[in-house]
């Protein structure tokens, strides 16, 4: 009996085949809408006096910053083909170098986090200076963390629909149609294929093997699990504004770092720290570190620094009120 699952044949990147509307694009639209509504709901629930037009300006800068940051990180950090350096306009245009429509197919959330902070910071110190958006900026970062995590799973479901960001080889896993096939001469490949019920014919030079659906595991822990921790736990024990955002950054980075061990490293980058070169299918080392893990460690440190800095800001405000 086969010990693997075939990728659903009916699932495609496009919502309707032949029409250039993708699940990936829709996921971003819905995440933005969920975040917009949920942040505003929290503002109203806590009776924060922020004008709707100021809030919309803030949200526009946040979304724009997140998209720009995510695209820049994806195209300039993860892509090693050099095409975005020679054709920089492709970073912001949904076309390939031959002007065929492709949609936006690359976003790196680490860059998105950075852009989602830098752009609103610029906005509140220029267009929204001396408004209540500036006054409650740290509180808004907390609201945004909760809102974004509530819809995050949609993005990972879209990754699954694209059959991308799949994990490493695993019995009982899913055979992704776009996964990199293995050379049948690699030690352990034939044995593994046989163990899961895949027949290798004498003329087969390459074979596709079942993999961990790591995008779904990431989505579950970085989405619903993180949201529930923020909403039901950390929101209750929050002592000062900005705390939840720092916790969110650290939670995301923590889950991402460890789930990354299940994920296939980016083909062009491989392991940034390659302590134990992979020579057979069974080779594995916790000391082999990917780019995603390095960025997650940096993100975790950033979250800790954010918590410390916002705590000092809170203490300073409290002290000035008391004196």
Swiss-Prot record:
Cellular localisation:
Cell inner membrane
Q: How does it sit in the membrane?
A: Multi-pass membrane protein
Q: What is its EC number?
A: 2.5.1.145
Q: List keywords of the entry alphabetically.
A: Cell inner membrane, Cell membrane, Membrane, Transferase, Transmembrane, Transmembrane helix
The principal localisation class reads: membrane
Q: Which molecular function term from Gene Ontology is one that the record holds? A: phosphatidylglycerol-prolipoprotein diacylglyceryl transferase activity
The record's function comment reads: Catalyzes the transfer of the diacylglyceryl group from phosphatidylglycerol to the sulfhydryl group of the N-terminal cysteine of a prolipoprotein, the first step in the formation of mature lipoproteins.
What NCBIfam families does the annotation carry? lgt
* Record's protein name: Phosphatidylglycerol--prolipoprotein diacylglyceryl transferase
Gene that codes for this?
Answer: lgt
């Amino acid at each position: 009996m086969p010990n693997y699952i075939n990728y659903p044949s009916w699932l495609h990147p496009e919502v309707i085949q032949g029409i250039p509307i993708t699940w990936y694009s829709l996921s971003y639209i819905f995440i933005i809408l969920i975040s917009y509504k949920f942040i505003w709901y929290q503002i109203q629930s806590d009776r924060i006096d922020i004008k709707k037009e100021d809030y919309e300006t803030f949200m526009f800068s946040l979304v724009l910053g997140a998209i720009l940051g995510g695209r820049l990180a994806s195209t300039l950090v993860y892509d090693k083909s050099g095409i975005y350096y020679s054709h920089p306009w492709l970073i912001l245009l949904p076309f390939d170098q031959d002007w065929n429509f492709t949609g936006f197919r690359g976003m790196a959330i680490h860059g998105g986090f950075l852009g989602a902070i830098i752009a609103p910071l610029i906005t509140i110190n220029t267009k929204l200076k001396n408004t209540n958006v500036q006054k409650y900026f740290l509180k808004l970062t907390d609201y945004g963390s909760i809102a974004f995590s509530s819809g995050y799973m949609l993005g990972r479901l879209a990754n699954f629909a694209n059959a991308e960001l799949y994990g490493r080889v695993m019995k009982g896993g899913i055979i992704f149609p776009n996964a990199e096939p293995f050379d049948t001469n690699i030690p352990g490949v034939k044995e593994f294929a046989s163990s899961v019920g895949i027949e290798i014919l004498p003329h087969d030079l390459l074979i596709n093997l079942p993999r961990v659906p790591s995008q779904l595991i990431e989505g579950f822990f970085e989405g619903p699990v993180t949201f529930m921790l923020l909403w039901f736990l950390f929101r209750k024990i929050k002592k000062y504004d900005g705390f939840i955002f720092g916790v969110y950054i650290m939670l995301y980075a923590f889950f991402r770092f460890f789930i990354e061990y299940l994920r296939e490293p980016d083909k062009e980058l491989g392991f940034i720290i390659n302590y134990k070169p992979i020579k057979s299918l069974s080779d594995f080392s916790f000391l082999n570190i990917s780019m995603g893990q390095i960025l997650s460690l940096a993100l975790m440190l950033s979250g800790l620094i954010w918590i410390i800095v916002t705590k000092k800001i809170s203490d300073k405000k409290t002290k000035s009120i008391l004196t």
